[in-house]
Each structure stands twice: as C-alpha cells, then as structure tokens.
Curated annotation (Swiss-Prot):
GO terms for biological process: photosynthesis. GO terms for cellular component: chloroplast thylakoid membrane; photosystem II reaction center. The lineage of its organism: Eukaryota, Rhodophyta, Bangiophyceae, Cyanidiales, Cyanidiaceae. It is a single-pass membrane protein. The chain crosses the membrane at residues 7-27. Its main location: plastid. InterPro entries: PSII_PsbJ, PSII_PsbJ_sf. Belongs to the PsbJ family. It comes from Cyanidioschyzon merolae (strain NIES-3377 / 10D). Keywords: Chloroplast, Membrane, Photosynthesis, Photosystem II, Plastid, Reaction center, Thylakoid, Transmembrane, Transmembrane helix. One of the components of the core complex of photosystem II (PSII). PSII is a light-driven water:plastoquinone oxidoreductase that uses light energy to abstract electrons from H(2)O, generating O(2) and a proton gradient subsequently used for ATP formation. It consists of a core antenna complex that captures photons, and an electron transfer chain that converts photonic excitation into a charge separation. PSII is composed of 1 copy each of membrane proteins PsbA, PsbB, PsbC, PsbD, PsbE, PsbF, PsbH, PsbI, PsbJ, PsbK, PsbL, PsbM, PsbT, PsbX, PsbY, PsbZ, Psb30/Ycf12, at least 3 peripheral proteins of the oxygen-evolving complex and a large number of cofactors. It forms dimeric complexes. PANTHER family: PHOTOSYSTEM II REACTION CENTER PROTEIN J. This is Photosystem II reaction center protein J.
Length: 39
C-alpha cells in the first residue's frame, strides 16, 4: 500500500463498487437476454 494517503479510500471504494455493479449488471443482463445462458 505505497499509495496510501495519495488516493482517498472512499474514492477507491466508490470506483470499485461501480465497477463491480457494472460487471454484475452486464452479467445478469446477458443471462436475462439469453446471451450468457451458455456460460
């Protein structure tokens, strides 16, 4: 953690949360539309 103090923890958590929600959203959208049914 060399960058501790340079990058706010809340900013990292916010970006990480948005990224996770985006990936999960795309996964469920693909499964719902039938594109991810083969995965």
């Amino acid at each position: 953690m060399a960058s501790t103090g340079r990058i706010p923890l809340w900013l990292v958590a916010t970006i990480g949360g948005i990224a996770v929600l985006t990936v999960l959203g795309l996964f469920f959208y693909g499964s719902y539309s039938g594109l991810g049914s083969s995965l």
